[in-house]
Structures are given as C-alpha cells and as structure tokens.
C-alpha cells in the first residue's frame, strides 16, 4: 500500500495534478465561451460586413472563423488534458502539449489578425467616409449593397453620413453626381421622421434646419460594432492565451516528472 502511494508520488505531485486539472477545466469552459462568442460575430448582428468587404479588410471575420475552430479545439484538448493529468501517462501528456501548442498558435493568429484589421477600419473615419462617398447611390452591386446598409444605419441610428450631413456637401460623391445639391444636399433619409416614417418637414431638412435633420454622424455606431466584434475575438482570445501559457508550462514540468 505504502509502495503504491510512493510510486504515485514519484509520477507527479498531487498539487501539480490538481493545478493541471483546474487549469484545463477553466480552459475548456473558456473555449466554449469563445466558440459561442465568435459564432455571434460571424452572424454579423450589426450587419456591417459590407463595409469591411468593400475595403478588403474583412479579416476580422476571418479571425472569427479561426477562433471558432480554436474555441472548440480548446474545449476538446483541455478535456483530454484533464484525463492526461489524472492518468499520469507520459504519452498522453506529450500528446496534450503538442495539440495545445498547435491550437495556441492558431489562436494567436486569430487575435492578431482581427485586432490589426480592426485598427485599420476604425482608427480614422476617412476610410469609411471614402467608401460612403464612392458607393452610396452608385449603380453597381457593391453600390446597391452599401446604399442599403447606409440607409438602414441612418434610419435606425438617426444619423447622417460618417461625421455628419456636411460630408455630402464638402466632398464629391456618387450621390452628388445623381442628385444635384440644389435638389437635395444630402440623402433624404437624413431627415427626421414621424412614427409613420414621414419626414417632419422635408423643406426644412433640405435647407439644413437642425430640428428636421439628423446632425450626428454614423461613425460612432460603426466603430462600436467593429469594436464589439474585435473584443469578442481578440481581447477574450488574448485572455485565454494568457491563462493557457502557464498551464502549458505546468504541463511541461509535469511531463518531466513522469
């Protein structure tokens, strides 16, 4: 009996085993959370993907697809890690370390990709403004898609343009080419409306009266949407990586004791 207990102790401290079990349970639960959160991102609840797709900077969503794989993999590998720690088998611990390292590298790529492309999109409103001016009212597939997006955002968020209505006046645009300034200086959906979707005062809106015109820009909403996606992919992902690293180091130490 005593010799069996001594043999078990030689194959790894119970404290180390306990740390590995607890650490991997937290990883597997975090992996499930990451999996669920990145599915929410790919569903594009804010419906801003067209803005990112037109610019070619849609890798925030590419990072989300990688994170879906990583979240589920964290769950599976961490579950295996719990079994490896309890079984105290050298081959199982080595397999766990190799698999976790692979998932770790992929998750690093997901976090970095999402964050860098988020920074490109929201660090300066000029890119969003340029897209809006180029594609809004343009007679192309991309133009029609972005026109629908901007119409929806301006109605739902009660905003106009990227920084405000003057975006449509100060710069040339596809909208201006189709609608002279004397007819309407900004899209009619910039006008305040009643509950029945009727403009409060179309002439007052056309003349720029603040009581009848949305004066705030839509960039804050767009930036918030992209930031929300990035938080779910990058910052939560980084938090999981920071927790996983010491667990892997403990597993390496445990491997040397077996």
Swiss-Prot record:
Positions in the Cytoplasmic compartment: 1-14, 87-91, 253-258
Expressing tissues: High expression restricted to ureteric urothelium (most superficial cells); low expression in prostate. Expression in normal urothelial cells is lost in culture. Some expression in tumor cell lines derived from urothelial malignancies.
CDD domains hit by this protein: uroplakin_I_like_LEL
Subcellular localization(s) per the UniProt record: Membrane
Family: Belongs to the tetraspanin (TM4SF) family.
Function: Component of the asymmetric unit membrane (AUM); a highly specialized biomembrane elaborated by terminally differentiated urothelial cells. May play an important role in normal bladder epithelial physiology, possibly in regulating membrane permeability of superficial umbrella cells or in stabilizing the apical membrane through AUM/cytoskeletal interactions.
Full protein name: Uroplakin-1a
Species this protein is from: Homo sapiens
